[in-house]
């Protein structure tokens, strides 16, 4: 019998300076499955990047990935940016309990 754990991924609203992004307040997924974390940034300008960070309990923020127009992938995650750049999705390909954190979507130059 396979035990399926739930991974709770907490997201925050806005950015540190401006409320240029909106995200769901929280979401969860089954362990081992992909977690798709959406972010809306409808007022993004042409030279602003989308950055994703996460903060695990009692630790400082950790950089995950960033992109301008193209989709990006690294060893931690993938970033899908829509063609009009008004929204993006961070994809954690195989979420585990270690991925439980507060995730920040930030738009900046």
Swiss-Prot record:
GO biological process terms held by the UniProt record: adaptive immune response; response to bacterium
Record carries keyword NAD: no
Coiled coil ranges: none
Disulphide bond pairs: 39-105
Domain Ig-like: 20-109
Cell membrane found in the keyword field: yes
Subunit note: Alpha-beta TR is a heterodimer composed of an alpha and beta chain; disulfide-linked. The alpha-beta TR is associated with the transmembrane signaling CD3 coreceptor proteins to form the TR-CD3 (TcR or TCR). The assembly of alpha-beta TR heterodimers with CD3 occurs in the endoplasmic reticulum where a single alpha-beta TR heterodimer associates with one CD3D-CD3E heterodimer, one CD3G-CD3E heterodimer and one CD247 homodimer forming a stable octameric structure. CD3D-CD3E and CD3G-CD3E heterodimers preferentially associate with TR alpha and TR beta chains, respectively.
The protein's name in its UniProt record: T cell receptor alpha variable 26-1
């Amino acid at each position: 019998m396979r035990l399926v754990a739930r991974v709770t991924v907490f997201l925050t609203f806005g950015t540190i300076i401006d409320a240029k992004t909106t995200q769901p307040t929280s979401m969860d997924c089954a362990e081992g499955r992909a977690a798709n974390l959406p972010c809306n940034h409808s007022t993004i300008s042409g030279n602003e990047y989308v950055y994703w960070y996460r903060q695990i309990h009692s630790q400082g923020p950790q950089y995950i990935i960033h992109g301008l127009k193209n989709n990006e992938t690294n060893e931690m995650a993938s970033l899908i940016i829509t063609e009009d750049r008004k929204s993006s999705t961070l994809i954690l390909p195989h979420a585990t309990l270690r991925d439980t954190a507060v995730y920040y979507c930030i738009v900046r130059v």
